[in-house]
């Protein structure tokens, strides 16, 4: 705070860290499975990588018949933001295929920027839950 001596207060500057490695990984440059470790996943499992949102870069393993996602603290994938419903979506494994199912969320679930109640997922699909954008990467087939 200035004490009226005519001396201006110092300006505070902020900086951000640019992570080129994360950008390259998310843009699909090079081999996406190798860059993310999806090729090392157990057979029949998959990986969700947070591309955008408060915890960008976080990874979630999909290896159970049903994996829940939402704002509820007991969700398997806890996405803590008001744009996410408490019980927002489920990721299900059906006959070797991964499917995302909206479970009655307020803001909906999007796959590749299109609203979906349910959708079978392919490697590289982008799932939006609230302000979070996650990329789906399938591991080796079972």
Curated annotation (Swiss-Prot):
Any one Gene Ontology cellular component term annotated for this protein: cytoplasm
PROSITE patterns found in the cross-reference section: FHA_DOMAIN (PS50006)
Boundaries of every FHA domain copy: 67-116
Domain of life: Bacteria
Modified residues (Phosphothreonine): 14
Main location: cytoplasm
Purpose of the protein: An essential component of the PknG signaling pathway. When unphosphorylated, it inhibits the activity of 2-oxoglutarate dehydrogenase. When phosphorylated it does not inhibit 2-oxoglutarate dehydrogenase.
Name recorded for this polypeptide: Oxoglutarate dehydrogenase inhibitor
Lineage: Bacteria, Bacillati, Actinomycetota, Actinomycetes, Mycobacteriales
